[in-house]
C-alpha cells in the first residue's frame, strides 16, 4: 500500500517536504542537538508539523535529529556533482512502539542481519504507516507483525512520546541517504507483566533475530551512550555486565542469549558497518520513556481518550484526537 508522507505548516496550508530537506531545519531548528518542541496534527493517514500552534494541532512533542544528520550536513555544504538527492520523493512517516510491561520493562528487537536497511540494530517494533491508517493502529500492526503480540482492547494505555528525524544511511561518511523518515514513538503500556507478554511472543524471523526487555537502569545507561557526542554519559556503578536476551536460530527456535553491556553501549561508527548496537533514535526514545516514568498525568486509554483541557507547558501530555483504534 502507499505510504504516509509528512507535511509541514510553514505558511497558510500544509505542504509536503522534499526528500532532500531537513525537517528539523525547515521548522527552525538551530545547530545544536535540540530537542525542539513541535506542534502536531496526528490524524488518520496524516502528520502535520509546525513550530507554532495551529488549528487542529492535538499534541506538542519533542523533535530531534542526530548531530550527524546527513540532510543537515548537505545543506551546509556547497553542491557537489554526483551528490544530488531525489527531487520527486517526500519524507515518509514511520511509527515505533515502546511497549512497557506492567513491571516497567520495555521491549527491544534486533533487526535481522539480512535486512537491507538498518540490519543488526536494536530497535522497538515499528515500520511504515499506511494510508488511511490510524497512527496507533499502525504501531500495533507492526508490533504484531514483528513479535506476534496482539494487545487486547482495554488492556493497555498509550501516549505519544516524541518525533525523530531518521536517515539511512545515517551519516554522510556511509554514503548519500536513500531513506528519510520522521519516526513517531508511541508509548504503549500493557497491563500484562514481562513474563506474560514474553510467553505470547512469536517473533517473525524474517525481520527479527533477537529480542530483550530493558529495565529502567539499563535503559538509562543505553540512553546515556549518546551517539555523536565526544564523551559518553556517566554510567551507574551497579550496572550489570550483561543482560539476558532471546535469540532466534536458523530453524526458528529460540535460545537464551547473554548480551554483554558493551554491545548495548556501542556508539555509531564513523564508517559503514553492521555491528550490533542500539540505534540512535532508540536511545532518544528510551530517554523520553525514562522521563515519562516520573510523570503523574495518565496517558490515553485504548479506545477512550482524555479531554485535552487547557494548554499544557510540558510536551507529549496532549492526547491524540478521538479515533477508534482497532488494536490490530
Swiss-Prot record:
<feature type="binding site">
    <location>
        <position position="142"/>
    </location>
    <ligand>
        <name>Mg(2+)</name>
    </ligand>
</feature>
<dbReference type="GO" id="GO:0005777">
    <property type="term" value="C:peroxisome"/>
</dbReference>
<dbReference type="GO" id="GO:0019677">
    <property type="term" value="P:NAD catabolic process"/>
</dbReference>
<dbReference type="InterPro" id="IPR015797">
    <property type="entry name" value="NUDIX_hydrolase-like_dom_sf"/>
</dbReference>
<feature type="domain" description="Nudix hydrolase">
    <location>
        <begin position="90"/>
        <end position="236"/>
    </location>
</feature>
<dbReference type="InterPro" id="IPR000086">
    <property type="entry name" value="NUDIX_hydrolase_dom"/>
</dbReference>
<feature type="binding site">
    <location>
        <position position="146"/>
    </location>
    <ligand>
        <name>Mg(2+)</name>
    </ligand>
</feature>
<protein>
    <recommendedName>
        <fullName>m7GpppN-mRNA hydrolase NUDT17</fullName>
        <ecNumber>3.6.1.62</ecNumber>
    </recommendedName>
</protein>
<comment type="function">
    <text>Acts as a decapping enzyme capable of hydrolyzing monomethylated capped RNAs (in vitro). Hydrolyzes monomethylated capped RNA after alpha and beta phosphates to form N(7)-methyl-GDP. Shows low activity towards unmethylated capped RNA.</text>
</comment>
<dbReference type="GO" id="GO:0046872">
    <property type="term" value="F:metal ion binding"/>
</dbReference>
<dbReference type="InterPro" id="IPR033716">
    <property type="entry name" value="Nudt17_dom"/>
</dbReference>
<feature type="short sequence motif" description="Nudix box">
    <location>
        <begin position="127"/>
        <end position="148"/>
    </location>
</feature>
<comment type="similarity">
    <text>Belongs to the Nudix hydrolase family.</text>
</comment>
<dbReference type="Pfam" id="PF00293">
    <property type="entry name" value="NUDIX"/>
</dbReference>
<keyword id="KW-0378">Hydrolase</keyword>
<dbReference type="GO" id="GO:0035529">
    <property type="term" value="F:NADH pyrophosphatase activity"/>
</dbReference>
<dbReference type="InterPro" id="IPR050241">
    <property type="entry name" value="NAD-cap_RNA_hydrolase_NudC"/>
</dbReference>
<feature type="region of interest" description="Disordered">
    <location>
        <begin position="299"/>
        <end position="328"/>
    </location>
</feature>
<keyword id="KW-0479">Metal-binding</keyword>
<keyword id="KW-0460">Magnesium</keyword>
<dbReference type="GO" id="GO:0006742">
    <property type="term" value="P:NADP catabolic process"/>
</dbReference>
<keyword id="KW-0464">Manganese</keyword>
<dbReference type="GO" id="GO:0006734">
    <property type="term" value="P:NADH metabolic process"/>
</dbReference>
